[in-house]
């Protein structure tokens, strides 16, 4: 897939006016955004996400490194040429940034008017875009007459007015309720699929990434610490930052508080098994427990979908009768005391799952 945006060794440093201290906003970022994809860029406040957006659309220039969009190195051309290049980059914002004194149609038409598009062509394009975002009947309304979700739809229509190849969405759903967020993300996905627009979604919400993105870049302290296919990052996050974000979106692992409550009710060993879209995975899990003579009670977990692929985890309470059986006996643990036999059977079940490639973690005792 062709690369639309290319960042190489990009850093952005600021000097504080009051102290003279150097602040590192973005540090040594190299990243490709492929044409036609939706890339989620996620990080906590202060991670450098919004600065990265301003570097991509050349509202700011990097302290070092290069930014190339659609084959043009924005860091190496005059400001006049950068302004022209920005017409190929649409932008939507958290707070909508609509003109209160203009109608909905007037807001969408504004960038076309600035670009000198003839009135008849402007009107045609505005009607087309308002129909696409489902607001054609509100063309003559004013922003204060719209809900937050409707305002963001206007923002999306305005960002698409000049038919850009690239759309930047900077925390575009952060001010919206969950239902409206899902609607706006679904609209952005339509923009990507039906119009072929490449989208970079800047967010601190991993659930938004799960719903819309093809790939995700995780930022921490100005650096991109992990990049990958969304499913791969969710199923096997490699960095602590990615692991924390995944937990907030899946809610499939017990928190320390939940774990304490589970232990009060379930005295057996608590083991969490990762669920993926592998064929027959659940049958293999059940078979491993049966072969070891282990009783498995499901006590926590959740399984969802990303791009129609299953993902999640299930936490079981594992117990075995004193004396052991199955794989535990075969491994020679039957001569131990009753408690050791039961523990050996559970160890055998866990070992069998891991040998079969199933990610299995025992929840540590409090």
Feature map (PLM): residue ranges:
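ABC ATPase NBD coupling module
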Residues: 19-20, 74-90, 114-120, 233-237
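A short, surface-exposed alpha-helical micro-motif characterized by mixed small hydrophobic
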Residues: 209-211
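A short, proline-enriched helix->beta-strand linker immediately N-terminal to the Walker B motif
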Residues: 161-165
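Conserved ABC ATPase signature
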Residues: 142-146, 150
